From Swiss-Prot:
Pfam families the record matches: YfiO
Membrane topology: Lipid-anchor
Keywords for the protein's UniProt record, in alphabetical order: Cell outer membrane, Lipoprotein, Membrane, Palmitate, Signal
Lipid-anchored residues (S-diacylglycerol cysteine): 23
Record PROSITE patterns: PROKAR_LIPOPROTEIN
Location(s) in or outside the cell: Cell outer membrane
Lineage: Bacteria, Pseudomonadati, Campylobacterota, Epsilonproteobacteria, Campylobacterales
Record's function text: Part of the outer membrane protein assembly complex, which is involved in assembly and insertion of beta-barrel proteins into the outer membrane.
Source organism of this protein record: Helicobacter pylori (strain ATCC 700392 / 26695)
Description of how the protein assembles with itself and partners: Part of the Bam complex.
Listed name of the protein: Outer membrane protein assembly factor BamD
UniProt signal peptide: 1-22
Length: 220
């Protein structure tokens, strides 16, 4: 009987705490507007520190809408871009870097910012290893960087990423050719094998990508 009363008491206590916390949060959210830029910026950094990136993104939206010309806006963009990349949220990382380039890019920083954007694509590569369009677009963007910023300190890193993407494209083309081979379509086999960069293959001698056995069973 005592146990039953204790459970009832515990349930009521927890309910009061939940309701009280909810009310406090609502009041807190209600009061969070028309704040100085530093308030939102510090909130962004705090939420990044605790890996609450969704809240950090919301704080950025408030900073952006209430203080569009604040010098803290570009700082927040960079911080959020790097935080999302660290958390492997590469699409969001690329978004922040791209927005920074469009709004605050200068001849002194645009190569670095473009490099960060390309780096987010590179890290996202394993999630898009069978996305022909993603790979092709990334190779083009990497080539444009090399052409546009031949003397950039980041060029060697971009060239490395470009090689990795081309090798990935080679592997994808070989896999697609194999599909056509299984379907007895020699024209398709020929078309995709011709797209392989044989020179790069000979120079780098890449190892096939590791693929778990449970993926291999259903692959292609």
């Amino acid at each position: 009987m005592r146990l039953k009363h204790f459970k009832t008491f515990l349930f009521i206590t927890m309910a009061i705490i939940v309701i009280g916390t909810g009310c406090a949060n609502k009041k807190k959210k209600k009061d969070e507007y028309n704040k100085p830029a530093i308030f939102w910026y510090q909130g962004i950094l705090r939420e990044i520190l605790f890996a609450n990136l969704e809240t950090a993104d919301n704080y950025y939206s408030s900073l952006q809408s209430e203080h569009i010309n604040s010098p803290l806006v570009p700082e927040a963009m960079l911080a959020l871009g790097q935080a999302h990349m660290k958390k492997k949220e590469y699409v969001l990382a690329s978004f922040y870097f791209d927005e920074y380039i469009k709004r605050f890019g200068t001849k002194d920083n645009v190569d670095y910012l473009t490099f960060l954007k390309l780096q987010s694509h590179y890290y996202a590569f394993k999630n898009h290893s069978k996305d022909q369009e993603f790979i092709s677009n990334s190779i083009v963007s990497l080539g444009e960087f090399i052409e546009k910023y031949p003397n950039s300190r980041y060029r060697p890193y971009v060239e490395y990423m470009q090689i990795k993407f081309i090798l990935g494209q080679n592997e994808l083309n070989r896999a697609i050719a194999n599909v056509y081979k299984k379907r007895h379509k020699p024209e398709g086999v020929k078309r995709y094998l011709e797209r392989i960069d044989e020179t790069l293959e000979k120079e780098t001698k890449p190892k096939p990508s590791h693929m778990p056995w449970y993926v291999l069973i259903f692959d292609w």
